[in-house]
């Protein structure tokens, strides 16, 4: 692989697909990396596969890391309820999965080093998901410092950059960029509820649908089962 290769953490959702598309636009070869971590919304994995094919990714890997073994989140523990009352400032919602991004980034860095990639792109953004501790600028800054020390590439002076281009964007801007880049939004999956149809009421659906409507694309909003 060349030094113009990016590893994209591809969940199957709108944010990660847009981040991957930005890497493609920048002329990078993009390798997708997705995770089966015991999430209730497993349909996102199907979405990730379809996105990888549609977007022409160089490779796409799906890794099993069963964080559902110990639960701790409504996304991995079916006894908990996915919230639909909206994000509360200063409160970490129960959709936070303990250690998820820390684990995913570590595996992404391993793949990046093996493929001699120079970047790892993530779709995290602090504006709409400020309750998640592992989606914040200070978290990524600290992780970058660790990454530069933790692998051969970093020690040799050509470390792997953690790139979060959406970090300070609101959802409407993400939608606008996705449309500009030709991201197949209809193939992305954001719903947390775990059904075959997007519920339209979980926080993830509500934030996505509001942004799509603001961007004039209400036709792409959730269509719950009748």
Swiss-Prot record:
Work out whether the entry's keyword set contains ATP-binding: yes
Name of the protein: 7-cyano-7-deazaguanine synthase
The record ties this protein, via InterPro entries, to: QueC, Rossmann-like_a/b/a_fold
Q: Give the UniProt keywords, A-Z.
A: ATP-binding, Ligase, Metal-binding, Nucleotide-binding, Queuosine biosynthesis, Zinc
Q: Which cofactor does it need?
A: Zn(2+)
Give the family, as the similarity comment puts it: Belongs to the QueC family.
| EC top class, as a word | ligase
Residues that hold Zn(2+) according to the record: 191, 199, 202, 205
Function of the molecule: Catalyzes the ATP-dependent conversion of 7-carboxy-7-deazaguanine (CDG) to 7-cyano-7-deazaguanine (preQ(0)).
Which BP terms in the Gene Ontology apply to this protein? queuosine biosynthetic process
- Record note on cofactor: Binds 1 zinc ion per subunit.
State whether keyword Lipid biosynthesis applies: no
Which positions does UniProt annotate for ATP binding?
10-20
Catalytic activity annotation: 7-carboxy-7-deazaguanine + NH4(+) + ATP = 7-cyano-7-deazaguanine + ADP + phosphate + H2O + H(+)
Report the source organism. Answer: Prochlorococcus marinus (strain MIT 9303)
Q: What is its EC number?
A: 6.3.4.20
